[in-house]
Amino acid sequence: MTRTILFILGGVLLGGIIHIVIVFLVPLYAGNDAWAEMGRFGPDRQFHMLPAPEAGAEPIPGMDPRMLQAVCRFDLGNGPLRVQAELPDEFWSVAVFDRRGRNVYSLNDRAAEGQKLDLAILTAVQMAQLRQSPPASLENAIVVDLPIQAGFVLLRAFIPDDSMLPSAHTALAGANCSGTF
């Protein structure tokens, strides 16, 4: 009788341990990370307007319906990235995410000076090379080195009312996401 109870307890304990390990390993084996998911909107190093959020079918979880959003996927192995945009007077923000969708850098209209966004994203090695001969075109740019190889940039503009939608859409559609300095 005692032996049977020990076997049952051992089986339940082993089953619980295996279950917990599998649950923690799922993200490592999931093929659809955030970076891969952003690839469905279009080619890398170009901003793509995200569709308006619909309940249960948001392109990015937790999207605000009063924000217009554009995404640019990148791989710094192909060179540094430069993000440039003339943004509306209302609130805007730019955020850089790693492959898994973790925010590694963000900036908004209050932290930046004016409505012109000029952001250069590099790896530490690219930053060291850039310091040896910095181009004059980066004089007014915000230059950041990030500990990531690939990720995506999310550019958001607040739409306080529908009359602001055309200007915000024009601003995000005109945003540039390339490797040219």
Language-model features: where?
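A compositional/structural signature for long, glycine/proline-rich flexible linkers
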Residues: 1-181
